[in-house]
Amino acid sequence: MQQEAAQRESEELQRVQWQPRRVRGWGVPKLLWFLVFLQPVITELHLRRRNVRFLFIRFSAWQYAGTDKLWAGLVTTLCEGIRHHYGALPFSVYSVLGNKPCGPRDGLCQREWHCRRRVCLALLALLAALCLGVGLLYLSLGGHAPGHGERGVLKALGGAATTLSGSGLLMAVYSVGKHLFVSQRKKIERLVSREKFGSQLGFMCEVKKEVELLTDFLCFLEIYQRRRLRVVLEVTGLDTCYPERVVGVLNAINTLLSDSHAPFIFILVVDPSILAACLESAGNMKGTADNGYLFLNRTVTLPFSVPIMGRRTKLQFLHDAVRSRDDLLFRELTIKLQPQSPGNLGAGEGTQLLAVETQGDAERTQGRVDAEAARRIQEALCCLHDEGDCLYEYVPDNVVSMRRIVNTVPITVRLLQQQQQQQPDRVGPTPRHAVAWVVLANQWPCRLSWVLQCLEDRQQAGGAPEGRSRLWDVFCDNSRELHTMTKALQNVLDLDGDPELFERFLGTDFPFTVAEAQSLLRCTVNLDHSIRRRMGLIRAVSALKPPSPPKSPSQDGPQASPRAIIAAGTSHAGQGSGHSKEAHQTRDRTHGGKPRPMA
């Protein structure tokens, strides 16, 4: 947008040869002169201008998430941003003495500025009255009056003229100073703090007046600077607020954009699915936004969805996330810079030497451990943004998820190193396997928790699989049972990523075994263990069979026994399930040659 604005600026300068006026530095006195004595006129020349300047203001809804009037925070941020950019004094003078730009009085007029005759005459009258009053006071007090009575009359007339003219000037200065120290933001915040006034219609009228004043000021600056102005408000963090407050912000945006000549552009940086859910769940939007996507289509004039992140872009983001970890070698550097603590002066020389040697050995050992940990962490993080490795393909196109993975890797590697120190005879996972396990737990927490829960249940039952068995095989053996629990685990299943990528991850690229999973599970910190507990409870409840009703001798003849009914139902169910299983396997063989699990 800035490049487009610069290009249009250069083209406009070549066309009209008029330089834009400055509004800062030495241009402020000229701007104040125009504000007080000249009236802007919207001419055809101004409407044909193509050069534009963008003013960017960022609004984080998270900062105002705790207030009831989130949309009021939007308006105050807008007012404060414009006031900060152009200065408090010009806006204060315009609030008191400024005039709204008007259209041309006749179609042939090309002048953009007209003299404000009323203001000039009023100012001349005040100055003349002030000079007259000062002169009369000078005559009455200087002894130039012929008589004592005339001297009193001159003194009274001079005092009245001086008081009236001076009070008029002082009132104007006082109003400018009041607007200079009391900004629009403070006004709106003061109105919001009044609970009774906030629920009345007058509150919205006052806010609308402030917004109209802001719009007129921007229109004045457009004519003065000889360029078009557009205020771009970037709204972020809206998906972290309550639905009612999200609706309030959208209503405020629609109110600000209701004027067709409003110089505002709003950019909503938000997930549309979350925004649509907020609109549908808001109580005050029933009947208006029953379908949140239709409401957004009526509100948003330019939808722009960020495309899928490319390979180079993802690697660059991962590289930046890794570089932001400035604490990888911090511990090693601080150990080298720590001053040596003085020994105990009262102890013997041998005791001091022994303590120094012991402390030196401990520091050297800890230094080697920290250096090895830093090396492993660096190796693991390099696997994330290595173009020759396939691990980056499983990282989501989300900066927040990237940082979550990068922040988890050092902790996992540290815990693995400590575990290997306790068991030096065992060969632990490599740093690449550690970061792959972190990605697995971050991308598919439900499926990974299901595999781990199945392993735990089989181990408790005494039929644990071998350590060389693959996790993918365990998942295939229990995928049908997981399919029957989709309704109970719907919210948890929504956390998982692409199922096909999960199959390729565990089946081909990273075939973790049961032994590796049990070793890595002790060092896993980014997996919610409550998911496994919930799955264990559901499996335990589904394993319970209802007791069969008691057998009645009187019903043996005319009716079949419940056992026979249950057996018949079981046989029919088995035939149906076997038929569906055969059909499913036949359908899968046409695609891959072996049956695929249902997950």
UniProtKB/Swiss-Prot annotation:
UniProt xrefs under Pfam families: KAP_NTPase
Transmembrane region(s): 25-45, 119-139, 156-176
Spans annotated as Disordered: 543-599
Lipid bilayer topology: Multi-pass membrane protein
Stretches assigned to the KAP NTPase domain: 1-416
Cellular component, GO, one term: membrane
Localization per Swiss-Prot or TrEMBL: Membrane
Keywords in alphabetical order: Membrane, Transmembrane, Transmembrane helix
Domain of life: Eukaryota
UniProt-listed InterPro entries: KAP_P-loop, NTPase_KAP_P-loop
Residue ranges with Basic and acidic residues bias: 579-591
This protein's name: NTPase KAP family P-loop domain-containing protein 1
Native species: Mus musculus
Gene: Nkpd1
